[in-house]
C-alpha cells in the first residue's frame, strides 16, 4: 500500500485523483465546485456526549438558497427584510438570488395567509386585518452568480459539463 504524507503548505496543479479515503485535518478551500455522489457533515453531537451527528446536504437540480424564519402578524400583516433577518448586508439577497418563491404557514391559527417577495422584502398578509397569528416562512431563491447546471448528460463523471460552469 502506498502512502503520501504532506506537511506544510503544498501547491498542486492539474488533476489529482485519489481512491479510498482522504482525511484533511483543518480547513480546505476550493475555488471551483465539489462533485460527489453525496455530501455530508459529521459533527460532535450538540446534546449527547460521546455521540456524533451526521446530515446529508440537500440536493437539487438548481443552486437554490434557502432562508426561513417565524414572524407574528400585527394587524394582519408582517414585513421581513430577508437580508436583515438572516444577518446579511443590505442588497445581498437581491444580488445573488433570482427566480424567488416564498412559502408561508400559519402555525397558531386558521386564518388564511399569503406571502409575496419584492426585492428583499417578504410581506405576509392575513385574510383578516385583526389576525395576530405566528407565521413560519421560507424564501427560496436561485443563485444568479453562477450558471445553471445541465442536469442530465451522457458519459462518465469525467465528462460532466458542469465541472466548468459552477466556478
Protein language model features and the residues they cover:
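Extracellular receptor-binding modules and their adjoining Ser/Thr/Gly/Asp/Asn-rich linkers
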Residues: 10-11, 26-167
